[in-house]
Structure formats: structure tokens, C-alpha cells
């Protein structure tokens, strides 16, 4: 068996069941049957996949896994790379020109967080040890959850009031085979 990364979805099971009851499913049996039953039997979600193409997990770890770090933003990653450069684990910060908070295309053209580029980033642990990125990717269903943002290219364009008019989504069309989670 492969090592995997999970999201503790079971901690949210009751809340998701409660919210599922507020959705106007068409047909209704999808929400009470297929999807509702899936929620009732919910298990923790294995969100990692062993592939090359896709969204990389933003997780770095020491070789012995005594320290694991999940990076929450590009600004945080830039700061962590600066620490790694100062510790001598990297020679330069490839994202040093990135300006956190600047949502312009020009700013985001300065970075590529896909493989193989992100795999070249070595962070430094609290003990000065190298931390390498976990090689797995995020399950594409996790990407699908970004639909409300991606449809408007938010926050890079069409933010503010325009975004608020479509979030959260009022209608999502899925094939019945997609309603099992």
C-alpha cells in the first residue's frame, strides 16, 4: 500500500448531512438516496494521487518525517524559500520577484507551481534539515471544488461584487455518476 494524505471529512459528516437536506435536488431521490447515503457512510477522503500532472500537494517534509509543513499561500512559500536560501539549502529564491497581494497577471506569470519546478524547492526545518516536497498531487475532485472561483478567474479578475453575485453557486449540473462524491 502507498502512503497517502487524507482530509478528515468524517469530522464534518453531520454538518454535511444537515446541509444536504437544504439542497433542492432534482430529482429529489439523488439527495436523499445516492448522495445522501454516500454522506451517511462517509469515510476520510484520500486526497493524494501518485501522478505527474496536476496540482501538487503543498506539503514539505524532512527525510524522516519528523517535521512536516503545509504551505498555505504563495506569500508563505516565498518567505519559507528565503529562509532556505539563508540556511544555504537553496542558492536563490526563484519567486523573489513575486509580490504577495498583487493579483495581476504579470505578477503571477513570475511563478510556476507545477512539477517539475515546485519539486526543486527545498525548505529548511526548524532544526536546519532539508525539507522536500511530497511527490503526490491533489485529487482532481479537490480542483473541481474551485468551480465558483475558476468560472470568473477570481481573484485575478472579476472580484468584488461580480463574484458575490455567483457565490455560492445556485445551480450545478452533474451526471448521476458524479453525485457519489
Which residue ranges define each predicted feature?
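Structured secondary-structure scaffolds
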Residues: 1-181
Amino acid at each position: 500500500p502507498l502512503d497517502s494524505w487524507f482530509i478528515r471529512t468524517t469530522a464534518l459528516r453531520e454538518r454535511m448531512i444537515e446541509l444536504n437536506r437544504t439542497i433542492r435536488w432534482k430529482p429529489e431521490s439523488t439527495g436523499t438516496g445516492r448522495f445522501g447515503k454516500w454522506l451517511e457512510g462517509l469515510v476520510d477522503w484520500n486526497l493524494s494521487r501518485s501522478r505527474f500532472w496536476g496540482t501538487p500537494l503543498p506539503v514539505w517534509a524532512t527525510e524522516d518525517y519528523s517535521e512536516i509543513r503545509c504551505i498555505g499561500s504563495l506569500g508563505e512559500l516565498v518567505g519559507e524559500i528565503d529562509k532556505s536560501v539563508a540556511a544555504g539549502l537553496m542558492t536563490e529564491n526563484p519567486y523573489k520577484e513575486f509580490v504577495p497581494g498583487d493579483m495581476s497577471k504579470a505578477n503571477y506569470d513570475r511563478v510556476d507551481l507545477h512539477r517539475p519546478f515546485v519539486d526543486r524547492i527545498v525548505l529548511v526545518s526548524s532544526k536546519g534539515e532539508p525539507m522536500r516536497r511530497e511527490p503526490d498531487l491533489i485529487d482532481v475532485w479537490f480542483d473541481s471544488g474551485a468551480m465558483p472561483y475558476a468560472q470568473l478567474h477570481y481573484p485575478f479578475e472579476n472580484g468584488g461584487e461580480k463574484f458575490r453575485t455567483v457565490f455560492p453557486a445556485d445551480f450545478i449540473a452533474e451526471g448521476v455518476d458524479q453525485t457519489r462524491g
